[in-house]
């Protein structure tokens, strides 16, 4: 169970952005659009971002495209590739205030980076369990409502936990960027948005999100 400190003023300290014009994750144009968004968001925030992926191949493809572009701006990003120490990544992230990280499951919960070390979390895709996951298959075989009973609530909770990475003490601030348009096009989208600790939710195009971040950081 994800328990967030209710004494924090999440509405004032956490802004949630939902990208309204992203292609859906199963569309061919999605990955290129995500890569553009990641480059622009990291530049607007001057680093200190945590991007939480659900798929290693997608993460590595994004990293290979995004990292060289950010390097031009002296923005460093690292990736949770095969064989890389999770502890080492955590330590590096905490030690370098401007470092950004592309990560997988082990960073969705239980990772604390208070203060300016973490200025934003990006969730490219809602963390639904794969239909081929053995537990999902077993539940689906004996319950035709298994997706709504188990898969959806688990994904909602995991997203809430990821949002909780941002505000770890009373004076923390940050942005949560949700790049999965299914939050707006599918009936279950409200379950995700209603679970978030902040009610400051802005539905904008990717370009508008970047402009809003730039205004906030330059104002």
Language-model-detected regions and their locations in the chain:
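ASCE RecA-like P-loop NTPase motor cores
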Residues: 1-219
